[in-house]
Amino acid sequence: MANQLRHSMAALSLCTAVMFAGPAFAEPNDGVEGLNAEQQAFAGRFLQFQDDMDEKLFGQAGKINGGHSSDVKETTKDQYADFYVRVARGDVVEKIGRMISRVYKPKSDIQRPTTFGRYYGLDVHAKSPLMGHVHSAIVLQYYTDGTGALGGTLNLLKGAAQEEDMKYVKNALDVVFEKHGRDPTPYRNRVCNSAQEDSVQPKYHRKLACVGASFFGFPMMEVNEENFLFMTEIYAAFVSSYLDTLEGRKDAPYTDEDVAKQEAMRLNWLEDQFLGDPYSSGGIAPYDVWGHAFLPPLVKF
């Protein structure tokens, strides 16, 4: 695992180094024309980061699968936002799904008007019940008053995930926290204890391992160089380290009890998305968008 962690951090450094290239997903009426020069630079880097993550994470999953059995992209547009969905499937990484939203105007009172807004969310569903399930998100927004914010969440739904693997993912995040001189405690506490406070119906809230971190629910981070590097690095470290463990565990035997835990986990995630999460249950993104990107490949009732 130590060699894998060094490999992950080396790949992370590469990702950080290349994210200054020209923006991806940039189109007319993209919102960047309403930003000053510094804001445009961060917006462009965030757009490029999205492309970098797609290439890295879908590529890593495809390598584990020995090639995806399918890889589909879809775009959905309405008056509030454009949604870009990509879903790939295979024998080991059963489903990896991504949703990017480009927001034009609020659809709910829990949103603020923006001049630029991007949400990048990615879920990984492993075939093996020993791997749990990853839900991750990172967002950059500039508001009409000229301020900006970074946020995100890094969730591991436990299922039958193994302690050794969860420790590996947790350590990968701790490397980034330490590098940037930040205390992980308040961010980790939100996934360990208090995130249910934001749930529409707390009894359906996702059951998370005390491994990841949440950067929502605080005064969100302002957009500056240090915060941008921290957020993009920790996001990449989380998903990539999970895929490392998935590759190492792909041929491990499992029991009927493990399968039952996976089935319960997937049902819990479905309930969370329909009844607990304010964004999905509140209709901010259409069901056919977030359902395609984030829901498990199979849920049993």
Regions found by a protein language model. Give the residues of each.
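Gly/Pro-rich turn-and-neighbor structural signature
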Residues: 27-111, 225-229, 243-251, 258-287
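Aromatic/basic-lined ligand-recognition segments
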Residues: 80-104, 195-219, 287, 291-299
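Boundary at the C-terminal end of the N-terminal hydrophobic targeting segment
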Residues: 21-26
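Internal mixed beta-strand/loop scaffold within catalytic domains of large alpha/beta enzymes
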Residues: 78-150
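Compact, glycine/acidic-enriched structural inserts
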Residues: 144-189
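Hydrophobic helical h-region of N-terminal Sec-dependent signal peptides
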Residues: 10, 14-19
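A contiguous, surface-oriented mixed alpha/beta subdomain in the mid-to-C-terminal portion of proteins
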Residues: 180-261, 265
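N-terminal secretory signal peptides that target proteins for export/translocation
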Residues: 1-4
